[in-house]
Design a protein with these regions (language model features):
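Extended, compositionally simple hydrophobic/Ser/Thr-rich segments
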Residues: 84-87, 91-104, 148-269
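Intrinsically disordered, low-complexity peptide-like regions
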Residues: 4-10, 22, 78, 219, ...
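Cys/His-rich metal-coordination motifs, chiefly Zn-binding "fingers/knuckles"
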Residues: 1-33, 41
């Protein structure tokens, strides 16, 4: 039962004016209903805002780690660059993420050199899993480095995987076996040498530059706007999607599946 806000007189539900003092009361009822509606909506509105904010934050964190491993907050490198050698041997595969610049060089022995700011280098994780050398930032670590570089010496290589905007080169390898390459998150690999067969997968705008790396046969999968150049004269099996493009040098037998605006073309030396 409503009451007049002016004199406190009890009112009928349908009353538009207070019979005692004549004060309009219709607006009071409407205001009460509006306030009740606002109170019922407030928890949902607040919850919606919180959910949107969390989604945006997660998106920023994901993109930052995907393209380089750096968040828009975190520590800043001192500018004092040091190089540390990691005591790891007996690996034939390399996995590097978090936006490193990488050189992979053929050599008679193993060496792993990491270069970064002196106040950040301890947050770089270098380990071995099976026959694979793994280099990345430690989990949940973010910083802006003056330099983030890895130089890897190894006698033989059978797999290279770059992610998170890692850019690198490999040279000196004359391989009689197949080489597997996996690039994601805008990574890039330039390679000089040769192998019997190349199996390559590139996604997320990555680039494979193998114009100076000769192979007999190749299986290439490009997606998400990735690009590649390869050199061969044997069989080329290619699956291209999402606006990707593949250049080839030589006269291979082609078996190509294009979709999503992708393309393939022959190029000169």
């Amino acid at each position: 039962m409503p009451f007049c806000r002016n004199c406190g007189n009890e009112l009928d539900e349908e009353a538009q004016f207070c019979p005692k003092c004549g004060t309009p009361v219709k607006n009071q009822v409407m205001e009460k209903q509006v306030r009740a509606r606002q109170r019922s909506m407030s928890p949902w509105l607040i919850a919606g805002i919180v959910i949107v904010a969390v989604i945006v934050l997660i998106g920023i964190i994901f993109i930052a780690f995907l393209f380089g491993g750096f968040l828009p907050f975190g520590r800043v490198g001192s500018g004092n660059i040091i190089t540390r050698e990691e005591p790891i041997n007996d690996f034939s595969a390399v996995e590097v993420g978090s936006g490193f610049n990488v050189q992979v060089l053929q050599a008679s022995s193993y060496r792993v050199l990491i270069t970064a700011d002196d106040n950040l280098i301890d947050d770089i994780q270098v380990s071995k899993s099976g026959n694979t050398l793994q280099i990345s930032l430690r989990p949940f670590v973010s910083f802006t480095a003056s330099s983030l570089k890895a130089v890897i010496y190894m006698p033989n290589v059978d797999r290279i995987q770059f992610s998170g905007g890692t850019i690198g080169s490999a040279s000196g390898f004359q391989l009689s076996h197949e080489l597997r390459v996996e690039l994601s998150g805008g990574s890039r690999l330039d390679m000089i040498g040769e192998a019997n067969k190349l199996i390559a997968s590139c996604s997320g705008g990555s680039r494979l530059n193998f114009g100076d790396f000769k192979v007999n046969d190749a299986e290439v999968n490009l997606s998400g706007g990735s690009q590649g150049t390869i050199r061969l004269d044997g069989n080329l099996n290619a699956d291209l999607s999402g606006g990707s493009h593949l250049n080839y040098i030589g006269n291979p037998t082609l078996n190509v599946n294009n979709s999503g605006g992708s393309s393939i073309s022959k190029t000169s030396n």
